[in-house]
UniProtKB/Swiss-Prot annotation:
Protein name: UDP-N-acetylenolpyruvoylglucosamine reductase
Location in the cell: Cytoplasm
PANTHER family: UDP-N-ACETYLENOLPYRUVOYLGLUCOSAMINE REDUCTASE
Major enzyme class: oxidoreductase
Gene symbol of the encoding locus: murB
Annotated FAD-binding PCMH-type domain residues: 17-188
InterPro entries: FAD-bd_PCMH, FAD-bd_PCMH-like_sf, FAD-bd_PCMH_sub1, FAD-bd_PCMH_sub2, MurB, MurB_C, MurB_C_sf, Oxid_FAD_bind_N
Length: 336
């Protein structure tokens, strides 16, 4: 029999700190644990929810489900002619992995430092920050295919990554459970400093190494984002919307200080934080939930609130942005 806990509290398993419970929860520390949990008779007929760090989820109420608490460890380094292949268990802490690879002389993940959550969640969201996305460092994932109950390896193309999206949020959402991730870190490392704020942070360092860039990213994120241990949050709550060059030019004509970033395909990514700030939401408190005073992209939970209240605020923000700018901003977290 698997290790099941009934009516298990999830407040410490979601970074918003919403006080909800799971019908059953099971700690998954190996692939054998995963198979045992899925084959347990108590799991029959129950929906399945996989939680890592709970840093990209909004829990709106108690879950009448089996919650798998992903805690599979592991770290190993392989080689390819032009790269190191780093494989980590899905339960490893993401920032811990970034720091470990740098400490072992394997640069490439430094721009993704201090992103909360676990390794297994990183491909689901195609995490990204300061000019780097996970897909640019990705080799493969190992996952359980629930249709066949066999473990499979999925490569870059199969994972269908796009901006904050992947196979695992679309057609494969209920099919695959990630147990390990393999990253490809080039031996020909070059710093990525195209993001203006990061470049300014390392000014004065003529040749910043990966550790210096990681430290700069940590400094920037620490200034802008609240610590979930102090204030409940999931980091950036909204995606930066993509618009055509024509739509961006129309907006720029009436808003000369609009913040936007050109994309390789000719479209533009608008800074959602700027849009929200211009609508007057930055620093707003709406009872136990609100908008962080230092970064309008971040929604916060001060305690005693609900996921439903947070989503109501998010909807209000999105509606206001659309009414003013004609652009719809979408949430990043998964809603359960």
């Amino acid at each position: 029999m698997a290790d099941f806990h009934e009516f298990y509290p999830l407040r410490r398993h979601n970074t918003f700190g919403f006080d909800v419970r799971a019908r059953y929860a099971s700690h998954i520390r190996s692939e054998a644990d995963l198979l045992a949990a899925l084959n347990d008779p108590r799991a029959v007929g129950l929906p399945l929810v996989v939680l890592g760090g709970g840093s990209n989820v909004v829990l709106t109420g108690d879950l009448d489900a089996l919650v798998l608490l992903m805690e599979i460890p592991g770290f190993r380094v392989g080689t390819a002619p032009d790269a190191w292949l780093v494989t980590a268990g899905a339960g490893e802490n993401w920032h811990g992995l970034v720091c470990r690879t740098i400490a072992e002389g394997l640069p490439g993940l430094e721009n993704l430092a201090l992103i909360p959550g676990t390794v297994g969640a990183a491909p689901i969201q195609n995490i990204g920050a300061y000019g780097v996305e996970l897909r640019e460092r990705f080799a493969s994932v190992r996952a359980l295919d629930r249709q066949t109950m066999r473990f499979v390896d999925l490569d870059l193309e199969q994972c269908a990554f796009s901006y904050r999206d992947s196979l695992f949020k679309q057609a494969g959402r209920d099919r695959y459970i990630i147990t390990a991730v393999t990253l490809r870190l080039s031996r020909d490392w070059q710093p990525v400093l195209a993001y203006g704020e990061l470049a300014r942070e390392v000014e004065g360092n003529a040749a910043p190494d990966a550790a210096a860039i990681r430290d700069a990213v940590i400094a920037i994120r620490s200034r802008k984002l609240p610590d979930p241990a102090q204030i409940g949050n999931a980091g950036s709550f909204f995606k930066n919307p993509l618009v055509s060059a024509e739509q961006r030019d129309v907006l720029l004509a009436s808003h000369p200080d609009l913040v936007s970033y050109a994309q390789p395909d000719g479209s533009f990514k608008l800074a959602a934080g700027w849009l929200i700030d211009r609508c007057g939401f930055k620093g707003l408190n709406d009872g136990p939930v609100g908008v962080y005073g230092k970064q309008a992209l971040v929604l916060v939970h001060h305690g005693g609130g609900t996921g439903a209240a947070l989503l109501a605020l998010a909807g209000r923000i999105a509606d206001t942005v659309q009414a003013r700018f004609g652009v719809r901003i979408e949430p990043e977290p998964v809603v359960l």
